[in-house]
Amino acid sequence: MRAFTYKDGKLYEDKELTIPVHCSNPTYEILKHVKIPSHLTDVIVYEQTYEQSLSRLIFVGLDSKGRRQYFYGKMHVQRRNSARDTIFIKVHRVIDKIHKFIDDTIEHKNDVLFQLGVFMLMETSFFIRMGKVKYLKENDTVGLLTLKNKNIVRENRKILIHFVGKDKIIHNFTVHSSNRLYKPLLRLIGRKEPDSFLFHKLSEKKVYKAVQQFGIRLKDLRTYGVNYTFLYNFWTNVKSLNPIPPIKKMISTSIKQTADIVGHTPSISKRAYIANTVLEYLTHDSELINTIRDISFDEFIRLITDYITNTQTV
């Protein structure tokens, strides 16, 4: 696809806006159906028909903070939403294998295996984005793989993790001495080398290879983690709140709690991570509250996974 520069409703073949795209180009049909936000700059619209745009990337632009924003067609968004159900089930089915991998590597003498064990334990604890070196260089944003020793501070009997991630969001996590992650993380920290990477023996390739053995992607763990955390918050709220607020209010509260834990906005939690089928189930089962009061969290998770699986196979 060719990329056209957009300006004031017009398309151009060059960034200097000297070569206008002919009005007969089918890309103009797309502009009749989409609204490009006025606050975006450096907007690029991709050449395609309107029908093609329904399932593809349509345009890209920079927001007021210089962050690149991507806008997709309706069918692409629908597919992405339905994929969250599949991801949740897929990760849930292998999460015990992932925990066993952590058990087998977290105290390993081999530095690479040990660091992979700590990496996976941190990921399944906090569901942090992986982070790439190119993003660190381009935007000075940090992820799990690009954490440095200076991002980890030991204070009394706890470890504080502090870094600036995607979209300049500040992340803070605490690892208490009673946490399983505490001792392995202490072993990993290089206090004399603050600017060195925490996981200096790992690379994107090594991490991807380790995760691929479970038939998932690393980003799937974050999607699973957001849903798992949301469901735990919802279950806990049902158990602890009295009187019980309306379901939609409790969903909203649980989403906000989840966003605070994971480190993004409630809107992003709901729009980009939480499986729609999960929300559907919580909203439409009139007996759910009474059911949750009498079951454990593991039993609640089984209810959710059974519902998603049955919905997918209808």
Curated annotation (Swiss-Prot):
Keyword line: DNA-binding, Isomerase, Late protein, Topoisomerase
Protein's UniProt name: DNA topoisomerase 1
Catalysed reaction, written as an equation: ATP-independent breakage of single-stranded DNA, followed by passage and rejoining
Alphabetized GO MF terms: DNA binding; DNA topoisomerase type I (single strand cut, ATP-independent) activity
UniProt-annotated catalytic positions: 273 (o-(3'-phospho-dna)-tyrosine intermediate)
Organism: Rabbit fibroma virus (strain Kasza)
InterPro entries, alphabetized: DNA_brk_join_enz (IPR011010), DNA_topo_I_N_sf (IPR035447), TopoI (IPR001631), TopoI_C (IPR027362), TopoI_cat_a-hlx-sub_euk (IPR014711), TopoI_cat_euk (IPR013500), TopoI_N_vir (IPR015346), TopoIB_AS (IPR018521)
Site location (Involved in religation): 167
PROSITE patterns the UniProt entry points to: TOPO_IB_1, TOPO_IB_2
EC nos: 5.6.2.1
An individual GO BP term: DNA topological change
Domain annotation Topo IB-type catalytic: ranges: 73-314
Pfam family, one: Topoisom_I
Role according to the record: Releases the supercoiling and torsional tension of DNA introduced during the DNA replication and transcription by transiently cleaving and rejoining one strand of the DNA duplex. Introduces a single-strand break via transesterification at a target site in duplex DNA. The scissile phosphodiester is attacked by the catalytic tyrosine of the enzyme, resulting in the formation of a DNA-(3'-phosphotyrosyl)-enzyme intermediate and the expulsion of a 5'-OH DNA strand. The free DNA strand then undergoes passage around the unbroken strand thus removing DNA supercoils.
Membership in a protein family: Belongs to the type IB topoisomerase family.
